[in-house]
Amino acid sequence: MSRLFTLVLIVLAMNVMMAIISDPVVEAVGCEECPMHCKGKMAKPTCDDGVCNCNV
């Protein structure tokens, strides 16, 4: 039973470490998806050089 508990603790510790170490990736939204991407933010979508910008 203690081996199982130790294994669970190791797995949980590894998950926490991976969450801390991994940096958040900013998803680039293309011009095609721009209107749907900005719709939830109540912003006006504009596309500059293939990159979506949501202007409030």
Swiss-Prot record:
Q: Which keywords belong to this entry?
A: Disulfide bond, Ion channel impairing toxin, Neurotoxin, Potassium channel impairing toxin, Secreted, Signal, Toxin
Which cystines does this chain contain?
31-47, 34-52, 38-54
Annotated compartments:
Secreted
Keyword Secreted, does the record have it? yes
Residue ranges annotated as propeptide are: 20-28
The leader peptide range reads 1-19
Tissue pattern of expression reads: Expressed by the venom gland.
GO CC terms in record: extracellular region
Q: Which InterPro entries match?
A: Scorpion_toxin-like_sf, Toxin_alpha-KTx_8/9
Pfam families associated with the record = Toxin_6
What would be an example GO MF term here? Answer: toxin activity
Q: What is known of its domains?
A: Has the structural arrangement of an alpha-helix connected to a beta-sheet by disulfide bonds (CSalpha/beta).
Similarity section: Belongs to the short scorpion toxin superfamily. Potassium channel inhibitor family. Alpha-KTx 09 subfamily.
Function recorded in the entry: Potassium channel inhibitor.
This chain belongs to the protein called Potassium channel toxin alpha-KTx 9.8
